[in-house]
Amino acid sequence: MAAFATGHSLGITGQEMNLGLKNYQQIPQRNEQIHYEGMTLINDTYNANPQSMREALKTLKEINTQGKRFFIIGDMLELGPLSEPAHHELGQEIAGSNVDYLVTVGPLASLAAESAKANAQQQLEIGRFATHTEAANYLLRKVRKGDCLLVKGSRGSKMENVVQEFLKPKKQSN
């Protein structure tokens, strides 16, 4: 409503605003929701830092799902001396959440897995992988109808490759 009021104050007609909303296109890799075969995949692979990882975890915690919650993370890069502590802190936050599966790709993300495992307050299955393909294959074995997956990592960790590898068999079978 505030957006319409702002548009109106700028002289934009209601018809123009409706047309703009109708033509809106989601920006790829930024909280992009993909629904297929009864599952939801949130592709938030454009970039990552400690705050955006916390927000992604919050999104996953709050999303309405009938199934399991999968948090698939890559390394948070370019944090300098804060890198290891940031990954350990993320793991602690994951441990206190309602995430069912933590899947990591990369050596720094693996630190988050270690911390999550050490601090888990409920059943948390953890998969640590060196490659995107290994992570995607793990997901293909574990994910079921009703599950929600959120994939996130720094640009340099190329977590979009996990999304592509995971969706590839689905696209070929359709």
Label for each model-derived stretch:
Residues 2-174:
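ATP-dependent carboxylate-amine ligase
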